[in-house]
UniProtKB/Swiss-Prot annotation:
This is Catalase-peroxidase 1. InterPro entries: Catalase_peroxidase (IPR000763), Haem_peroxidase (IPR002016), Haem_peroxidase_sf (IPR010255), Peroxidases_AS (IPR019794). One of its GO terms (biological process) is hydrogen peroxide catabolic process. SUPFAM superfamilies: Heme-dependent peroxidases. GO terms for molecular function: catalase activity; heme binding; metal ion binding. The keyword Oxidoreductase applies. The gene is katG1.
């Protein structure tokens, strides 16, 4: 290509301005500009299924038993192009499921197996996911057969669960309902490193400073480095890494030991060869490789000669059956450091009995030493983990039960409440990590409840702020939080600084009495009060409206709430209420963008909500920043009118504060934060602000505000169609 546009004989026939793989992006030109792309994902333009397709309804038509039968058959149907170890694909399928679910992190709820994201970059090409492309390709005939009735996300998780069943474990259950995405996620921060296995996520040497929200120690790993900290064996240091990373996946010490042991009871590591012969990962592979990566085109590279992690060997004597052999070998033998054929650090037993060695994956007449990773040795050497391991060793049934429950938690943690689970194998038991909420009353007089709220002495700001605070905790990432359950009245939420405990206590006292009088749940009354406040504010602006409301929220109790698990939902900032708990390295407008994405809102919904909430008097602690109106409590478009008025000039005052002055007179009219001014500064957000500032769009502003408000209030109403 010589780049001469229009030269049809010797030049490139493609207009370079339209090329998809070249050119400089806006982000490259202006790296500090607010990037709204994370709010514009997973829409109809990328989804081939059409707007009328509803996976959660389609999966109900699935022949569940036939699918499971086919998966059982797949486990022992070894394919020549990628042979099964010992004739059983169980270990491979479990690793695929584990690595899909294990990317979840509790801090922001992102990652996990709920979207089928392992099919896309970067996860499909992570160093920790070497050869999992083969597992998904082995599943393709089953996906092809059952089609739209089973998502990749569900199938990837189910395959690991069925693998355990096929090897003798009684699993705890399974819930269908994970919907596929169709392109890589733009909102997930996997780390700032520019190279695989980079580790620029710590700022000290004691391994306690892993960057939030990350839950893996190096770029491209699921949790810890199996060879040791930064590839150097040290089981006690690795134990610290294990505890931190599993904790950030919402697992306690017992669950951590169970998952580590149960994951390593079956299958093996692969490092019997030279890693330099592996081809590039899937995203960098040649077009003729058709999406498969790490292809060895130099040596055999399959079966006993496979290289994945570089560690070589099985953990147990019988790697295709569920048993207690992991603890038997780990606790009864002494172990020494060795190097695998691929050059990776691993632990091997000293003076092991021949009958305790696992056989070769291809020739049962050959036996090899079992191996342990540094993480396994951490289970043996860390005193807390060791005590748990010894109990599991002495009580195999207890171990199997704890593991089955932990596996279920691992693979369902990002699905939200149990009401979202579909299928015949959903456990009846309510689990506290599912944040259970009882069914609410729908048969009460909504009009009477609204009348009592309107007659109370609550201000518009108090009603709207309380409803907002109750609902804003919702995270679309793992479907946690939200207004349903009214957990804002329970610990820890009632004491969060962002919820203004003194104001909250006053408002809840009044709303709880109204709930008791009308038979409504407190959760419903909180939302209803916000709606009443908005209706009053719209009337003050000259518009009579009814804010949509769907009754039926329930009230959770302390017994239904794992208070500690809700700590990660505490808002440390809220641009919608113009509040920061403290100064952060990240710019306030970027924090608001992250919050907006988690809440499932678009850029124009964010815009209209901020503009409306400012004039309703909902700022945290009643600050006046961004309140560009002299009619507080009226749902007007004044925020946008005054933001876009060139009669004003914006002057920096101090960190994150600005003065809005009259351009001619110079007097201060208002103050603002960066969150306010970004709606006039960012070209995209300004285009939305101008729409809402127009003289003919006062009604549209209210209509759009109410629609966005209702979306937030109902974000966790999975019971609604």
């Amino acid at each position: 290509m010589d780049g001469k546009v229009g030269n049809t004989t010797t030049g490139c026939p493609v207009m370079h301005g339209g090329m998809t793989s070249a050119g400089t992006s806006n982000t490259a030109w202006w790296p500090n500009a607010l990037n709204l792309d994370i709010l514009h994902q997973h829409d109809t333009k990328t989804n081939p299924m059409g707007k009328d397709f509803n996976y959660r309804e389609e999966v109900k038509k699935l022949n569940f038993e036939a699918l499971k039968k086919d998966l059982h058959a797949l486990m022992t149907d070894s394919q020549a192009w990628w042979p099964a170890d010992w004739g059983h694909y169980g270990g491979l399928m479990i690793r695929m499921s584990w690595h899909a679910a294990g990317s979840y992190r509790v801090a922001d709820g992102r990652g996990g197996a709920g979207t089928g994201n392992q099919r896309f970059a970067p996860l499909n090409s992570w160093p920790d996911n070497v050869n999992l492309d083969k597992a998904r390709r082995l599943l393709w005939p089953i996906k092809k057969k059952y089609g739209n009735k089973i998502s990749w996300a569900d199938l990837i998780v189910l395959a690991g669960t069925i693998a355990y069943e096929s090897m003798g474990l009684k699993t705890f259950g399974f819930g269908f309902g994970r919907e596929d995405i169709w392109h890589p996620e733009k909102d997930v921060y996997w780390g700032s490193e520019q190279e695989w296995l980079g580790a620029k996520r710590y700022d000290d040497k004691d391994r306690q400073s892993l960057e939030t929200p990350l839950a893996a120690v190096q770029m491209g790993l699921i949790y810890v480095n199996p060879e040791g900290v930064n590839g150097q064996p040290d089981p006690l240091r690795t134990a610290q890494d294990v505890r931190v990373t599993f904790g950030r996946m919402a697992m306690n010490d017992e669950e951590t030991v169970a998952l580590t042991a149960g994951g390593h009871t079956v299958g093996k590591c692969h490092g019997n060869g030279n890693a330099k012969f592996l081809g590039p990962e899937p995203e960098a592979a040649d077009i003729e490789d058709q999406g498969l990566g790490w292809i060895n085109k130099t040596t055999r590279g399959i079966g006993r000669n496979t290289v994945s992690s570089g560690i070589e060997g099985a953990w147990t004597t019988h790697p295709t059956q569920w048993d207690n052999g992991y603890f038997y070998l780990l606790l009864n033998y002494d172990w020494e450091l060795k190097k695998s054929p691929a050059g990776a650090w691993q632990w091997e037993p000293i003076h092991i009995k021949e009958e305790d060695k696992p056989v070769d994956v291809e020739d049962p007449a050959i036996r090899h030493n079992p191996i342990m990773t540094d993480a396994d040795m951490a289970i043996k050497m860390d005193p807390v983990y060791r005590k748990i391991a010894e109990r599991f060793y002495k009580d195999p049934d207890y171990f199997a039960e704890v593991f089955a429950r932990a596996w279920f938690k691992l693979t369902h943690r990002d699905m939200g409440p149990k009401t979202r689970y579909i299928g015949p194998d959903v456990p009846k038991e309510d689990l506290i990590w599912q944040d259970p909420v009882p069914a609410g009353n729908r048969a009460y007089d909504i009009a009477a409840a609204k009348a009592k709220i309107a007659a109370s002495n609550l201000t518009i700001g108090e009603m709207v702020s309380t409803a907002w605070d109750s609902a804003r905790t919702f995270r679309g990432s793992d479907k946690r939080g939200g207004a349903n359950g009214a957990r804002i009245r329970l610990k820890p939420q009632k004491d969060w600084e962002g919820n203004e405990p003194q104001r909250l206590t006053k408002v809840l006292r009044i709303l709880e009495d109204i709930a008791a009088d009308t038979g409504a749940s407190v959760a419903d009354v909180i939302v209803l009060a916000g709606n009443v406040g908005i209706e009053k504010a719209a009337k003050a602006a000259g518009f009579d409206i009814i804010v949509p409301f769907a009754p039926g929220r329930g009230d959770a109790t302390d017994d239904m709430t794992d208070a500690e698990s809700f700590d990660v939902l505490e808002p440390l900032h809220d641009g919608y209420r113009n509040w920061l708990k403290k100064a952060y390295d990240v710019r306030p407008e970027e924090l608001m963008l992250d919050r907006t994405q988690l809440m499932g809102l678009t850029a124009h919904e964010m815009t209209v909500l901020v503009g409306g909430l400012r004039v309703l008097g909902t700022n945290h602690n009643n600050t006046q920043h961004g309140v560009f109106t002299d009619r507080v409590g009226a749902l007007t478009n004044d925020f946008f009118v005054n933001l876009t008025d060139m009669a004003n000039v914006w002057i920096p005052s101090k960190d994150n504060l600005y003065e809005i002055r009259d351009r001619k007179a110079g007097n201060i009219k208002w103050t603002a934060t960066r969150v306010d001014l970004v709606f006039g500064s960012n070209s995209i957000l300004r285009s939305y602000a101008e729409v809402y500032a127009q003289d003919d769009n006062k009604g549209k502003f209210i209509q759009d505000f109410v629609a966005a408000w209702t979306k937030v209030m109902n974000a966790d109403r999975f019971d609604l169609a």
